Amino acid sequence: MSHNDTIVAQATPPGRGGVGILRISGLKARDVAQEVLGKLPKPRHADYLPFKDVDGSALDQGIALWFPGPNSFTGEDVLELQGHGGPVILDLLLKRILTLPGVRIARPGEFSERAFLNDKLDLAQAEAIADLIDASSEQAARSALNSLQGAFSARVNHLVEALTHLRIYVEAAIDFPDEEIDFLSDGKIEAQLNGVIADLDAVRTEARQGSLLREGMKVVIAGRPNAGKSSLLNALAGREAAIVTDIAGTTRDVLREHIHIDGMPLHIIDTAGLRDASDEVERIGIERAWQEIEQADRVLFMVDGTTTDAVDPADIWPDFIARLPKNLPITVVRNKADITGETLGISEVNGHSLVRLSARTGEGVDVLRNHLKQSMGFDTNMEGGFLARRRHLQALAEAAEHLEQGKAQLLGAWAGELLAEELRLAQQSLSEITGEFTSDDLLGRIFSSFCIGK
């Protein structure tokens, strides 16, 4: 589809509401105003007008806002019609606008895409619009707004600028080898490179925090039947999300709860008790449990403290530990401390965290909450943070790898040409975040995930 078309879409959620907004952007927006309103409203002023059908009869009446380009969200002429939020009324008005030549329904995210293409915002800011809409906590919303206002982009642009200056210095050393000063060995380039690496590490740390705020952590509760997995899910969720009985195998499918710990999203998954089951339904539930375990960020290995004194997971259930994916973090949770009389709290056992608690009474659950937050490195006190996506983390990691490779070339062989190439690749990776260097394929995937009307 052409970006020269004029596009229209409903900017408010579908369904009934007090207000319904249609947004129009493009060369024909002026014609839409003349046809539907009978006049062109004063720029950036609210005008209360009837919205007219083809025969001149009123379909609705409301507020019209006119934003002539380039001083608009998309950089094009933009008209917003704010009428009553009834689905029938909005549908009639939308059909009326689509009778005009050169006007079509917008694709999901096309308004934001046009804003990006017209340099009204960069790609990280455009993504922040969707993240702000999807924010699941106050902290996530504030961080998304910071990204929208350019906080993340400013940090990335600072790195790109520093790399640009460093590349100039390195390439000057390559192009003018006969100068009296040996630019590659006088220590200045190494010092500048170390400075960029340190700045990039700081941005990566903040980006990981932003990714946690956006993506959250997937925690799977696993263990034998009747270990108290569902009771722990209920304790963490603060409500009776799962049925709890003394009958082994009560939970036969995956149960999911979404909670927040000091702003960090946590996806808690309760699974069927793991054992050799003859019942077909229970067997399917156990297989699904293993599928969830394999995709987890952390596993809470639930142990009934009344059945064993062991604390090392390899001693408690070696077959379970052997089947777990390599490098998957495990927290051993010894449950039923209210019965065993164990001291509540957290300790380390052979590289694994061990938490003693009572899921039934809730004693020790706060210790587990703090452990989950700390295990992901989540900092609740970070001010002015920004949200980050997985593609951002990947781009930052690639840039860091190129800088380390470049440093190795500099220190190992004084290879200026190879250092210059690694600096170029690092700069390219960073530019993918803001969209200065991005494939059309990636743009399509990003903007297609947006709401229609955004």
Curated annotation (Swiss-Prot):
(6S)-5-formyl-5,6,7,8-tetrahydrofolate binds at R23, E80, K120, K454. Mg(2+) binds at S230, T251. GO terms for biological process: tRNA methylation; tRNA wobble uridine modification. It is found in: Cytoplasm. GTP binds at residues 226-231, 245-251, 270-273, 335-338, 358-360. Its EC number is 3.6.-.-. Keywords: Cytoplasm, GTP-binding, Hydrolase, Magnesium, Metal-binding, Nucleotide-binding, Potassium, tRNA processing. K(+) binds at N226, T245, I247, T250. Exhibits a very high intrinsic GTPase hydrolysis rate. Involved in the addition of a carboxymethylaminomethyl (cmnm) group at the wobble position (U34) of certain tRNAs, forming tRNA-cmnm(5)s(2)U34. Belongs to the TRAFAC class TrmE-Era-EngA-EngB-Septin-like GTPase superfamily. TrmE GTPase family. Homodimer. Heterotetramer of two MnmE and two MnmG subunits. This is tRNA modification GTPase MnmE.
